[in-house]
A protein has these predicted regions:
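Class I S-adenosyl-L-methionine-dependent methyltransferase module
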Residues: 277-284
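Secondary-structure boundary motif
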Residues: 248, 273-277
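Class I S-adenosyl-L-methionine
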Residues: 1-256
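A phosphate-binding catalytic loop at a beta-strand-loop-alpha-helix junction
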Residues: 253-274
Length: 284
């Protein structure tokens, strides 16, 4: 490798010449239901999207995740302190990927409680009011009954989220929450933690408390090796979150992982730790 300073008149061209053949090889090595994650900074993310659209196909774009790589501002910055970094995800064949999920976290479960001592356990709730108006969704407009105050309720402008038959089922299943004394103007629909299947849909904003920071990664390596050796190491927590994503319900415990730029061996560390935690047989 040779340095590619931004003073070079071919700065972006040289970078593209470096990354293009590597991504071609990456695609050829991916399984049909495989995915690739690429960490990149703001300097080249726009170029990388174009290259990936060409190599993998625009339709195989999965997500552009925003990773919070640090949480403290730098007063040495002249304009803005960069706290985040893009993380691109592409699939080899998007039709082979029906869903991507991740395991539920303690943070996600913490929103569930049981203020009314429901025998079904902890729950959270969602609004019953539809953003659409009655004119837009006339089939979702009908009167509701508040059993606590014994009053009929209708929304002045908006429809409900559910058809009347579904509402009647919610009533039979005692899923509507009107408040402790019926004080809510409109009901909320109960969602029970016990009904969750232990997984959730991932979001495209990854906070540092869940995925680590570059500063912590550097400290971990320095503590391990006795001195600073790498400038842009990724935290193992970030890689572990990537590897923990479940594609089509598969936890990927026997997955084969390839890191094209394995400088500090963070990917190897993450693979070995995950295997130790869940008994997997991942290889790298």
């Amino acid at each position: 490798f040779k340095k590619n300073p931004d003073s070079n008149g071919r700065f972006h061209t040289d970078w593209l010449n470096m990354i293009y053949p590597r991504l071609r090889v990456a695609k050829s090595l991916l399984a049909d239901d495989g995915v690739i994650f690429i960490s990149i900074d703001d300097n080249e993310v726009h170029n990388l999207r174009k290259v990936c659209d060409e190599i993998f196909g625009e339709g195989n774009f999965v997500s552009q995740i925003v990773w919070e790589k640090r949480y403290t501002r730098s007063n040495n910055s002249k304009k803005f302190t960069t706290l985040t970094e893009p993380l691109l995800c592409y699939s080899k064949n998007i039709t082979s990927i029906l869903e991507i999920k991740e395991k539920r976290s303690k943070k996600a479960d913490s929103i569930y409680s049981n203020p009314d001592n429901d025998p079904r356990g902890a729950w959270t709730s969602v609004s019953y009011v539809n953003p659409a108006t009655k004119e837009q969704r006339p089939n979702l407009s009908y009167p509701l009954f508040n059993p606590i105050t014994e009053t009929t309720v209708d929304h002045p402008t908006n429809a409900w989220k559910y058809e009347k038959a579904t509402y009647e089922q919610h009533v039979r299943e005692d899923r509507l929450y009107w408040g402790r004394t019926g004080e809510n103007s409109y009901p909320r629909l109960k969602k029970f933690l016990s009904e969750m299947d232990g997984v959730m849909v991932p979001v495209d904003l990854w906070r540092q408390e869940d995925t680590g920071t570059t500063d912590q990664a550097s400290k971990d390596i320095e503590n391990l090796l006795g001195r600073k050796m790498f400038d842009f190491s990724k935290p193992k927590e970030l890689v572990m979150r990537i590897l923990s994503l479940m594609i089509n319900g598969d936890e990927g415990k026997d997955a084969l992982i390839l890191d094209f730029f394995s400088g500090s061996a963070t990917t190897a560390h993450a693979v070995m730790q995950l295997n130790a935690e869940d008994g997997g047989a991942r290889k790298f």
